[in-house]
Amino acid sequence: MDEKLLKTIAESKYLVALTGAGVSAESGIPTFRGKDGLWNRYRPEELANPQAFAKDPEKVWKWYAWRMEKVFNAQPNKAHQAFAELERLGVLKCLITQNVDDLHERAGSRNVIHLHGSLRVVRCTSCNNSFEVESAPKIPPLPKCDKCGSLLRPGVVWFGEMLPPDVLDRAMREVERADVIIVAGTSAVVQPAASLPLIVKQRGGAIIEINPDETPLTPIADYSLRGKAGEVMDELVRHVRKALS
């Protein structure tokens, strides 16, 4: 393990992380853009946008119920556990994720920002009542709001929708404080998440990229570690723990 990399992490004043679908892929949750990605079997425009939901809510809900079932049955992997350990060590201050599962939290991470919402949450299309669910709904029937009776929808951000302003503001505040960012398992193409590491870089901070493949972020990353997030993060945290002891 690169000693300079370990020093960068151990001596960081405010380290944050940005994680994407590649982190949860090792838990059996399909990615969207990998070779075996979810979008290879389904057209995203058919399923993950407001128009598709308005046109055929049952079809969209069936797909999301299937995804929710996968998430609820999945277990955190070595990457999730490693990020939680970095937080326990006092090194990682905040974890920003593009993932809509709760595997970071179940691994023990506490300060997590979900940019794209969560499959654990459903919300009303009319009154905005939202609540957490413990299991995937059985479709049909379509789930209805217990307050106003309107149709419920998954609590995620769809294509064509804006990120909740408070969530994006919080993420921006975190990266503006950061002197190091670990970017793991993300294709670095989905905005505005892809711009977050650039803010750290522009402010003189370091980017540590972890990905099996090169991404648009690779040319400007200070460190690019090739491999699966679970394997790389597990080894990285073991070395960081030693460096801190």
From Swiss-Prot:
Keyword Transcription regulation: yes
Family annotation (NCBIfam families): PRK00481.1-3 (NF001753), prot_deacyl_CobB (NF040867)
UniProt key word Repeat: no
UniProt-annotated binding residues for Zn(2+): 124, 127, 145, 148
Protein name: NAD-dependent protein deacylase 1
Note: The two SIR2 homologs in this organism, Af1 and Af2, display different substrate specificities in vitro. Af1 cannot deacetylate histones but does deacetylate BSA in a NAD-dependent manner.
EC number from the UniProt entry: 2.3.1.286
Organism: Archaeoglobus fulgidus (strain ATCC 49558 / DSM 4304 / JCM 9628 / NBRC 100126 / VC-16)
Outcome (variant: residue 33 to A): Reduces activity by 20%
Required cofactor(s): Zn(2+)
Family assignment from sequence similarity: Belongs to the sirtuin family. Class III subfamily.
